[in-house]
């Protein structure tokens, strides 16, 4: 009786253990089952000609690389205007060159590299990158495009080497390389100033070095082993540093490492000390090293971007103090809040702004007809409030009174400086959020009623502490109703000047909407301190920028009634993305996968699942497979399984994401899918050839199959290449157009 | 066969008295004073309205779960449905049978107690451990509160436990008597219980997935069992009913039969049952009601009353000259009809952009005479249906003429008021400036069978593609400002990528226009339509639409005073006040037995750590446990710890408003795990008899403390005793607990 759960599966033999390092692999001894399969393959030359074989090996690799570079760099300069997201990433490259601070939802490495490429190629950062379609004119943009195309070109050789290592079959690797070289989608995506070629470069580099280091497993702690292991770590850091999609490849490497360690741990010939060494090496190379590099990119990012720019408002007041040009930079204000201080109060949630009031009343029918209180994103005199004691109305700035600091838990009154009305709340429903209470300005010259009293509290601090400017996170709790001052983030109608709604929420949940900090602080009786003391430390900056990025990412929500790309559209190549041009006179580039390649990939996934499960069931039933078939099934299950895992990890998480999705998000998954296709067809054709061995032409089946696949993809590329290299003339709906017969799906509009 | 003639008939009853006692105590704790309080408690206000809908057989749509749950609650009904469920705390009128409505959830809660006992026993743990699990279920305050009201969690938990229990029974049968009668019974029951659980609440899917997963692993091991034949010659054997239940034949049964039986019971039966729930639901609620508007016109027309009354007798095929109302298929943000009125777009918008100053076209969410449009043949002038009528087909060119103003639907290269990237849609007024009418539209039937299909009322979903600019008529979803009376904006979308509901329209009301004269036509438009065609949607079409709308319906995330986050559940940092007596301070809270919650989480942590330790040791070939104990430990963990994980962790990914009661299914699995861990510690980790005795004493002490806590919290569970403010304050053990104290 086999064990009920656990244990049994892990000990199965589906382990990618054996193999040799690097190019020698193909020359490995015949003991290896996988290599044995290759040994009998028709492509395999005789033993005597090792030298010739090595030359051939390198020549093929060179050919693949050359072809990849040639296709990617062909007509790279066209169109000479901004295409699609170049407007963002080119602009961000310029920001690095100009050293102005900006905000983006992706980590900085990709844009930093683009900026560096531009800088080295002589681009001066003066082009505005305003909107797609703007001409570059005399500005040098080829450096940035060339850099992206350079990285994008490496995808093909990387995939080639990965498949070669996984399947030990040149034909599988060639097929994969052809699929990727001739895919119009990969080609288009590599030709422009985008993050995707950089991201995919790191993903594939990580995959390749992981596979390489797996095949070095029989020589642990040797130089190549260390090299590939640390290279994996570096690539992981790179992938994560470009986009958070890099997390998926990290997950894949992580799963692979866990399985690997589990295997080593079960190897009783290894002492626990050796296993410990293995563990330490992986922790060092796959956790510590990437983390250090990733942090370093952020350090560089913050060092380079030292000037105030368009991204300031997304960050907290303390953060802004470190940007030169920002009005908080080098400012000096009193550190602790005291009665009589004039302050501005900023909401901690991104893009909400400052507590604001103005001489306009809430309109008839919306709560009480009292003065409006809103939040406002821009600096304005109406953002100023005076903090006063709740029970006295004397002027605390009178020099005869001693300075009295505001402390956590004090009951205060906030008086609007311009209109002398008090911040007030009562049991009327708020204008937009019906479950909350309305907040108004009330009273004349500071005299109101008990609904003007608020308790000021510092989040997570002890009672009695003083309140620090910028650093303290404070809440205002309404004394009578017990509700908390917050902003719902909803835009008020025209009567509220489209500022944001301020409410008093009865739900005492700690959300950022109800937490504020004091930004400006004027009090002549207090000594000013330089804000530099308050500057956040590097870990704080790192944490904050991540919070802002994550919030920005989840804030990219699709609107109702808008066409959005759905993950299920992607593998079937349902619709593309317009990179440039709309009308028939425009130079049009359309991001769309080569349908022959993509539909072949889709078919291959289905075929793989089918054949894989047949083989797995057969093995579980204890079927005795001939040596050759066993070898091929090992390739299919181990090599194919790893690649399939990659595809799964890079595709299915998108179904769970709430943010806006685009077609180009599928491309990392598509790389894995193409590798799977290469492995699958090669193996299936070999199995076919083996099954029909009695037939005289059996060996030819494999060669003919691979050749026809190669030629088929090449021909389809010839048909579809105008999608990537650009087309002018009538649209494909028009029967006159040369592309007319190629609009195979109604949803493609090129 | 005639054996009973030869031997005397003997009935031997095997009664497990502890099981009977447990059931009795369970019933007592759940049914005691069931009708108290005779007032609406918390979510009863929500489920109650659906019970009323069932009683009145009115169609409704609820996104919280499939209809089986509501049906189970309504089963206890038997009243006329006349009660206004609008306020928590409202006194029930005398026509509401409170006892019978609350009976089914209470019974489900009571039966969970003996089932916990059975499950632990079937996991091959001792009678003592099994008793422990059942007694813990018995005194868990949160479970008691939740089962004594018209709420669904206790029923869900009942079916979850039933699914696990019957799977275990089936699995234990598998070893000695596969394909016996009881084997089939338990296997089928597993499938049935799973689909019932899913039918109660979508949450039931989690347990279903768990059972499927465990079954798949077991089936995989079965595949590896080389003593079973392949598809082979024994196929006929297992197909013959005679061999069922015969042990000697079991060796010959093929693997294929095993897999097939599992697939049928665990995949086919649940799907069929799930469809059956909807079938019964749609048969029961056949009258139109307040939720009609959300559904498509075709669906509404299949209900009795409502739209069916209006559309009954409309001509089916739209012809040139037909008068129609056009409803947007997407129905978001509100269902609405294509509309126009005398007013024009303002010359200059507030942001300074200009408009064409032509007649507004909007989407209007109410029935109105201005929603009528006439389908006109561009080549002819008349606005009446010729005889015989010439039906409009896919690909035909049409003009849409607004019935009350006789202006035709037009779009041109002017930015729309709120969506400047799209084209403005207007009804054309000839100002005699160089802006010609562009009012030709090509009709595309989206759900056509062939390219020559006729445009049908209600059934056809159509798009209007503008001939000059190839823009598509679309509902943008934005509300126009005051000049547009806050109606919805209609635009011409130029970049139409594929199918989207907001560009698709269907004819709802329809009649053949007969009067050429404008005055007469206006009168005609004001009068209701008639003539008769029956159109019935098939069950599958209605099911798929209903299911789709239920899943797509998203109530805007309303914050709630008692909503909580999953992290707060494990340590019971939150509670929900369910009910407060109108005069005294007697109150009911959803508040768990904190001793059980904390020790459950502890047991889980211990289980995880111990398992990791054992796994690592086994990997190094050190076997601490004998093989059978190890298998028992793994299976118990897979079901109990796994059950907790699948019922808890997915909530972290959910964006909807969450409440403490969502944690209860996970909690029951934790309670099942507790005695398992305790017995394991006593059996395998206590080395001497002395240690074992000390451990037992500790367990007894711990259990008494749990009992004590349960008893202390009892007034908040049953709400039967009014406590003084002082006593209430003493019960507020955590600052985050919200216990209601009256201010006098």
UniProtKB/Swiss-Prot annotation, chain A:
Keyword Membrane recorded: yes
Glycosylated residues, per the record, are 98, 330, 445, 528, 583
Give the MIR domain ranges: 334-390, 403-459, 464-521
Tell me the route in metabolism or biology where this protein functions. Protein modification; protein glycosylation
Read off the Gene3D superfamilies from this record.
Answer: 2.80.10.50
UniProt keyword annotation of Repeat present = yes
Q: How is its activity regulated?
A: Slightly activated by Mg(2+) and inhibited by both Ca(+) and Mn(2+). EDTA ha no effect on activity in vitro.
Please give the tissue specificity annotation from the record for this chain. Highly expressed in testis; detected at low levels in most tissues.
Q: Which GO terms fall under biological process for this protein?
A: basement membrane organization; dentate gyrus development; protein O-linked mannosylation; reactive gliosis
Record-stated family: Belongs to the glycosyltransferase 39 family.
Please state what the protein is called: Protein O-mannosyl-transferase 2
Name the lineage.
Eukaryota, Metazoa, Chordata, Craniata, Vertebrata
Give the gene that encodes this protein. Answer: POMT2
């Amino acid at each position: 009786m086999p064990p009920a759960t656990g244990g049994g599966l892990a000990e199965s033999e589906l382990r990618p253990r054996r193999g040799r390092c690097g190019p020698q692999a193909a020359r490995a001894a015949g003991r290896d089952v996988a290599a044995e399969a290759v040994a009998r393959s028709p492509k395999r030359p005789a033993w005597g000609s090792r030298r010739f074989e090595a030359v051939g090996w390198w020549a093929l690799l060179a050919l693949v690389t050359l072809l990849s570079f040639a296709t990617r760099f062909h007509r790279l300069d066209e169109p000479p205007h901004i295409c699609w997201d170049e407007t963002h990433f080119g602009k961000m490259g310029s920001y690095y060159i100009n050293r102005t601070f900006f905000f983006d939802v992706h980590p900085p490495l990709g844009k930093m590299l683009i900026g560096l490429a531009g800088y080295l190629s002589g681009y001066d950062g003066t082009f505005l990158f305003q909107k797609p379609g703007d001409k570059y004119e005399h500005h040098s943009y080829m450096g940035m495009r060339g850099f992206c195309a350079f990285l994008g070109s490496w995808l093909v050789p990387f995939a080639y080497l990965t498949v070669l290592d996984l399947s030990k079959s040149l034909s599988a690797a060639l097929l994969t390389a052809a699929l990727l070289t001739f895919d119009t989608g990969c080609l288009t995506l590599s030709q422009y100033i985008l993050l995707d070629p950089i991201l995919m470069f790191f993903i594939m580099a990580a995959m390749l070095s992981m596979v390489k280091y797996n095949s070095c497993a029989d020589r642990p702690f040797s130089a190549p082993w260390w090299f590939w292991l640390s290279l994996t770590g570096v690539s992981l850091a790179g992938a994560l540093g470009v986009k958070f999609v890099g997390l998926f490849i990290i997950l894949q490497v992580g799963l692979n490492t866990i399985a690997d360690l589990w295997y080593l741990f079960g190897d009783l010939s290894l002492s626990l000390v050796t296993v410990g060494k293995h563990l330490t090496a992986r922790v060092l190379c796959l956790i510590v090293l990437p983390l250090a590099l990733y942090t370093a990119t952020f350090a560089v990012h913050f060092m380079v971007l030292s000037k105030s720019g368009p991204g300031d408002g997304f960050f907290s007041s303390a953060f802004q103090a470190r940007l030169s040009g920002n009005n908080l930079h080098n400012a000096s204000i009193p550190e602790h809040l005291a009665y009589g201080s004039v302050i501005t109060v900023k909401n901690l949630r991104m893009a909400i702004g400052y507590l604001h009031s103005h001489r306009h009343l809430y309109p008839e029918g919306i709560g009480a007809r009292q003065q409006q209180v809103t939040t406002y994103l821009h600096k304005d005199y109406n953002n100023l409030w005076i903090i006063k004691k709740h029970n006295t109305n004397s002027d605390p700035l009178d020099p005869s009174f001693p300075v009295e600091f505001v402390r956590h838990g004090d009951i205060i009154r906030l008086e609007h400086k311009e209109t002398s009305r008090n911040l007030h709340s009562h049991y009327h429903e708020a204008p937009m959020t019906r479950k909350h209470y309305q907040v108004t300005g009330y009273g004349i010259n500071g005299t109101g009623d008990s609904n003007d009293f608020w308790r000021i509290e510092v989040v997570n601090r002890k009672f009695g502490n003083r309140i620090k400017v910028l650093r303290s996170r404070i809440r205002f709790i309404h004394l009578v109703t017990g509700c908390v001052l917050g902003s719902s983030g909803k835009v008020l109608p025209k009567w509220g000047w489209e500022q944001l709604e301020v409410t008093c929420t009865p739900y005492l949940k700690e959300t950022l909407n109800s937490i504020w900090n004091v930004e400006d602080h004027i009090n002549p009786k207090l000594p000013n301190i330089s804000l530099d003391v308050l500057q956040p430390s590097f870990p704080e900056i790192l944490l904050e920028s991540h919070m802002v990025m994550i919030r920005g990412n989840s804030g990219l929500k699709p609107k109702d009634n808008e066409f959005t790309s759905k993950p299920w559209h992607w593998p079937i190549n349902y619709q593309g993305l317009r990179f440039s041009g709309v009308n028939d006179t425009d130079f049009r580039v359309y991001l769309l996968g080569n349908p022959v390649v993509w539909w072949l990939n889709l078919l291959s996934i289905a075929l793989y699942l089918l054949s894989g499960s047949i083989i797995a069931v057969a093995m579980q039933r204890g079927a005795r497979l001939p040596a050759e078939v066993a070898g091929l099934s090992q390739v299919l299950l181990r090599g194919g399984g790893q690649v399939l895992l990659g595809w799964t990890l890079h595709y299915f998480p998108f179904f769970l994401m709430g943010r806006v999705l685009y077609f180009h998000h599928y491309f990392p998954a598509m790389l894995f899918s193409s590798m799977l296709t290469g492995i699958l067809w090669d193996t299936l054709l070999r199995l076919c050839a083996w099954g029909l061995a009695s037939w005289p032409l059996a060996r030819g089946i494999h060669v003919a199959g691979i050749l026809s696949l190669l030629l088929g993809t090449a021909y389809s590329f010839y048909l579809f290449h105008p999608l990537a290299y650009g087309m002018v003339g009538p649209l494909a709906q028009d029967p006159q157009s040369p592309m007319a017969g190629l609009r195979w799906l109604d949803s493609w509009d090129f | 066969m005639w054996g009973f003639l030869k031997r005397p008939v003997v009935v031997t009853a095997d009664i497990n008295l502890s099981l009977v006692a447990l059931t009795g105590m369970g019933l007592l704790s759940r049914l005691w004073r069931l009708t108290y309080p005779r007032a609406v408690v918390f979510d009863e206000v929500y489920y109650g309205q659906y019970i009323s809908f069932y009683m009145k057989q009115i169609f409704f749509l609820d996104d919280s779960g499939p209809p089986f749950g509501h049906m189970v609650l309504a089963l206890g009904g038997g009243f006329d449905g006349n009660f206004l469920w609008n306020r928590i705390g409202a006194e029930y009128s005398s026509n509401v049978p409170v006892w019978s409505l609350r009976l089914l959830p209470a019974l489900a809660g009571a039966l969970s107690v003996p089932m916990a006992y059975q499950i632990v026993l079937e996991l091959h743990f001792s009678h003592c451990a099994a008793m422990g699990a059942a007694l813990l279920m018995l005194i868990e305050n949160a479970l008691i509160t939740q089962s004594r009201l018209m709420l669904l969690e206790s029923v869900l938990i009942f079916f979850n436990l039933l699914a696990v229990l019957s799977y275990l029974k089936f699995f234990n049968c598998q070893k000695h008597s596969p394909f016996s009668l009881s084997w089939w019974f338990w296997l089928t029951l597993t499938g049935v219980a799973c689909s019932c659980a899913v039918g109660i609440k979508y949450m039931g899917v989690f347990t279903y997935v768990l059972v499927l997963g465990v079954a798949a692993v077991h089936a995989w091991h079965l595949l590896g069992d080389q003593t079973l034949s392949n598809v082979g010659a024994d196929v006929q054997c297992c197909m013959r009913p005679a061999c069922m239940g015969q042990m000697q034949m079991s060796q010959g049964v093929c693997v294929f039969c095993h897999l097939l039986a599992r697939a049928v019971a665990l995949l086919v039966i649940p799907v069929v049952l799930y469809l059956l729930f909807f079938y019964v639901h749609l048969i029961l609620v056949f009258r139109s009601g307040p939720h009609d508007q959300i559904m498509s016109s075709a669906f509404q027309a299949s209900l009795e009353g409502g739209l069916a009354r209006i559309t009954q007798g409309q001509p089916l095929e739209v012809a040139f000259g037909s008068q129609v109302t056009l409803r947007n298929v997407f129905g978001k943000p509100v269902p609405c009809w294509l509309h126009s009125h005398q007013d024009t777009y303002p010359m200059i918008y507030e942001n300074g952009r200009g408009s064409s100053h032509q007649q507004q076209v909007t989407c209007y969410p109410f029935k109105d005479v201005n929603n009528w449009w006439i389908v006109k043949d561009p080549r002819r002038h008349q606005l009446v249906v010729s005889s015989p009528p010439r039906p409009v087909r896919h690909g035909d060119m049409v003009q849409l003429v607004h019935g009350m103003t006789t202006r035709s639907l037009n779009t041109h290269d002017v930015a729309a008021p709120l969506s400047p990237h799209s084209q403005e849609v207007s009804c054309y007024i000839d100002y005699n400036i160089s802006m010609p009418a562009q009012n030709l539209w090509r009709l595309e039937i989206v759900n056509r069978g062939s390219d020559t299909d006729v445009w049908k009322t209600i059934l056809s979903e159509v798009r209007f593609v503008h001939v000059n600019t190839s823009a598509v008529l679309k509902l943008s979803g934005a509300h126009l400002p005051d000049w547009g009376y806050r109606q919805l904006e209609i635009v011409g979308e130029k970049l139409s990528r594929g199918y989207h509901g907001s560009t698709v329209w269907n004819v709802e009301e329809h009649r053949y226009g007969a009067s050429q004269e404008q005055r007469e036509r206006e009168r005609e438009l004001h009068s209701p339509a008639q003539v008769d065609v029956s159109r019935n949607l098939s069950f599958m079409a209605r099911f798929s639409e209903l299911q789709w709308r239920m899943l797509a319906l998203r109530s805007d995330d309303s914050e709630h005073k008692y909503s909580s986050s999953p992290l707060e559940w494990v340590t019971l940092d939150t509670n929900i006040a369910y009910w407060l007596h109108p005069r005294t301070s007697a109150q009911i809270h959803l508040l768990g037995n904190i001793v059980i919650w904390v020790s459950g989480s502890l047991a889980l942590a211990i289980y995880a750590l111990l398992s990791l330790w054992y796994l690592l040791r086994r990997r190094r070939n050190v076997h601490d446990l004998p093989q059978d104990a190890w298998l028992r430990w793994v299976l118990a963990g897979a079901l109990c710890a796994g059950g907790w994980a699948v019922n808890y962790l997915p909530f972290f990914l959910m964006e909807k408003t969450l409440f403490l009661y969502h944690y209860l299914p996970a909690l029951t699995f934790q309670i099942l795990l507790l005695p398992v861990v305790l017995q394991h510690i006593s059996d395998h980790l206590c080395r001497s008899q002395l240690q074992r005795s000390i451990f037992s004493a500790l367990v007894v002490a711990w259990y008494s403390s749990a009992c004590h806590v349960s008893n202390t919290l009892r007034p908040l569970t049953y709400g039967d005793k009014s406590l003084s403010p002082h006593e209430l304050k003493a019960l507020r053990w955590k600052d985050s607990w919200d216990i209601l104290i009256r201010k006098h």
